[in-house]
Amino acid sequence: MIFRQLFEPTSSAYTYLIGCEETREAALIDPVLETAERDLAAIRELGLTLKYTIETHIHADHVTGAAQLRDKTGSKAAVPEPSNADHADLAVREGEAIMIGKLRLEPLFTPGHTDDHYAYVLHGADGARVFTGDALMIDGCGRTDFQNGDAATLYRSVHDKIFALPDDALVYPGHDYQQRRVSSVGQERGRNPRLGGGKSVDEFVAIMAALNLPRPKKMDVAVPANLECGEVQAD
């Protein structure tokens, strides 16, 4: 497997490049418009063909690079079915794997940060990796106070879906504001200050209710654009 973790500094967002060594097909999870050219350069340098861009959810802090990458490569935009995004080529559903060459990416419906959120599990010879988007971060999680988010729902999603994976499954988050790169399911289950360490759903709901976070600066632009797979920004 070919794997790259790519960072976008303005929104502290991670994009993940996954490639099949045998077929040379590739996918990008959560590409960002401002770094789409960088991602495309990496794909070309590695001799890969971009088959899919894959969203974890409709983002509020950046615009997806899906449309721009599709225009340049013919890739397909895979978006969670509950997003109801215009111009999507593939509706992501739990139980329907996304094949990237010989690699099998398993979608997990993990609402709570937003009501359309998905995580993705990739099983390989070296174990499992889970791309958690904003559902689970390193020592944290995404907010639950917009886009039909719900703290109790997020708690159940993480505990029932992500924490059900093996302890040694690697956790690759959608963001990290300290540029930490990777954790594990066992580590987050044991010590995540919001969701781990045996915290109850009521404790988690209280933690999230007390955050009082500011509105994302790009939300009014990003959400409408992402509901069109970035087409508005790509035109």
Go through each PLM region and give its residues.
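Catalytic core of the metallo-beta-lactamase
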Residues: 1-50, 86-176
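Active-site metal-binding motif and surrounding structural segment of the metallo-beta-lactamase
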Residues: 35-78
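Short, hinge-like loop/turn segments at secondary-structure boundaries
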Residues: 45, 70-74, 94-98, 188-190
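Generic structural signal for helix capping and beta-alpha/helix-loop junctions
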Residues: 60, 85-87, 179
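Residue-level signal for the nucleotide or nucleotide-sugar donor/cofactor binding architecture
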Residues: 64, 148-149, 199
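Short, polar loop motifs at secondary-structure junctions
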Residues: 78-85
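Accessory terminal helices/loops
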Residues: 156-170, 174-235
